[in-house]
Curated annotation (Swiss-Prot):
N(1)-(5-phospho-beta-D-ribosyl)glycinamide binds at residues 22-23, 82, 286, 356, 363-364. This is Formate-dependent phosphoribosylglycinamide formyltransferase. Pfam families: ATP-grasp, PurT_C, RS_preATP-grasp-like. Belongs to the PurK/PurT family.
Length: 393
């Protein structure tokens, strides 16, 4: 039975969030609504989730000793990783010592590294995936490309948001894709995965929540990527009943193997009735931002309920809905957003501005949300709202 105490008192239920981006911010807001005391930790000050938490700490998230020191001082009831770039070995140790990691330390560890999760899905669970090789050297990588043929995809085994990812179409791309992968890895230069290209019709994120009452799926989320980064998403993605059932089977197998409680974003490729597993995040997913307008319980509310052991009897979906990101390019520590009245002038629209403290290059700084009579209309409306926002650097 779940019992939640009073924040900032001896009875408080404490959650420590590792990583404080826009997804973490929404998780914190949902936890705050349930009277949870939230401590936010990231590598830079004034990160979005820190702005809505009770207090925060700035540390190098890959420094196991620093992470342990904060967790031992705060004594949280739940440790909730929101990003991949964390000292996962320390989380494994802390879990063994009695701390609760969401969903589990093993899930966080396996999914930080594309190799761990790919081998689990393809080799242990025997799920359909693209053909793949791993390589540590340019020589092995070149052999793998030759073996898989063109087109193929290369990614660092440890990276996020599409960093270091390339689609190779010919021998001209081999060297530059290798160089880009070496720059884009979270832990610096190193191992890459080379995947055969699947000629899919579309890709989806199946938001899958493991909670006290079992496993529940949100309606499938379709999305469009550019250079591995999400640009827009929509829900529900139209699918055949066979493809949807197979997607749910694959998502359930992967999330069951990872264990624990919480929301998972399972990425899948779909061609007709065929489904291939791509990746999984053991936390809310950027493409799932659409659920802020498309569902009565957003992915963030679902994650909060699952963490706290609260039931999820039903997820109500409101019909065709879409999200379109607000990308900012340039350099600023005082970005402002104008023309918001025009952006919100149509019915069934909403904005989320993330409050990120700076932009240096290109950064996702907000998202526009919309509902309409069809997916096409909802996507167009969300895009209009996003484009209407005027960014002042």
């Amino acid at each position: 039975m779940t019992r939640i105490g009073t924040p900032l008192s001896p009875t408080a239920t404490r959650v420590l969030l590792c990583g404080c981006g826009e997804l973490g911010k929404e998780v914190v807001i949902e936890l705050q609504r349930l009277g949870v005391e939230v401590i936010a930790v990231d590598r830079y000050a004034n990160a979005p989730a820190m702005q809505v938490a009770h207090r925060s700490h700035v540390i190098n998230m890959l420094d196991g000793a620093a992470l342990r020191a904060v967790i031992e001082a705060e004594k949280p009831h739940f440790i909730v990783p929101e990003i991949e770039a964390i000292a996962t070995a320390t989380l494994v140790e802390l879990e063994a010592e009695g701390f609760t990691v969401i969903p589990t330390a093993r899930a966080t560890s396996l999914t930080m590294n594309r190799e761990g999760i790919r081998r689990l899905a393809a080799e242990e669970l025997d799920l359909p995936t693209s053909p793949y090789h791993f390589a540590d050297t340019f020589e092995d990588y070149s052999k793998a490309v030759q073996d898989l043929g063109f087109p193929c995809v290369v990614k660092p085994v440890m990276s996020s948001s599409g960093k270091g990812q390339s689609l190779l179409r010919s021998t001209d791309d081999v060297q530059k894709a290798w160089d880009y992968a070496q720059e884009g890895g979270r832990a610096g230069k190193g191992r890459v995965i080379i995947e055969g290209f699947i000629d899919f019709d579309y890709e989806i994120t199946l938001l899958t929540v493991r909670h006290i009452g079992g496993t529940t799926f949100c309606a499938p989320v379709g999305h469009r990527q550019e250079k591995g980064d999400y640009q827009e998403s929509w829900q529900p993605q139209a699918m055949s009943p066979i493809a949807l059932a197979e997607s749910e089977r694959v998502a359930k197998a992967v999330t069951e193997a990872l264990g624990g409680r919480g929301l998972f974003g399972v990425e899948l490729f779909i061609k007709g009735d065929q489904v291939w597993f791509s990746e999984v995040s053991p936390r809310p997913h950027d493409t799932g931002l659409v659920t802020l307008i498309s569902q009565d319980l957003s992915q963030f509310a679902l994650h909060a309920r699952a963490i706290l052991g609260l039931p999820i009897p039903l997820i109500r979906q409101f019909g065709p809905s879409a999200s379109a990101v607000i990308l900012v390019e340039g350099q600023s520590t005082q970005t402002a957003f104008a023309n918001l009245g025009a952006a919100l002038s149509e019915p069934d629209t909403a904005l989320r501005l993330f409050g990120k403290p700076e932009v240096n290059g290109q950064r996702r700084m907000g998202v526009a949300l919309a509902r309409d009579e069809s997916i096409e209309a909802a996507r167009a409306k969300a895009t209009r709202a996003s484009k209407a926002v005027v960014v002042e650097l």
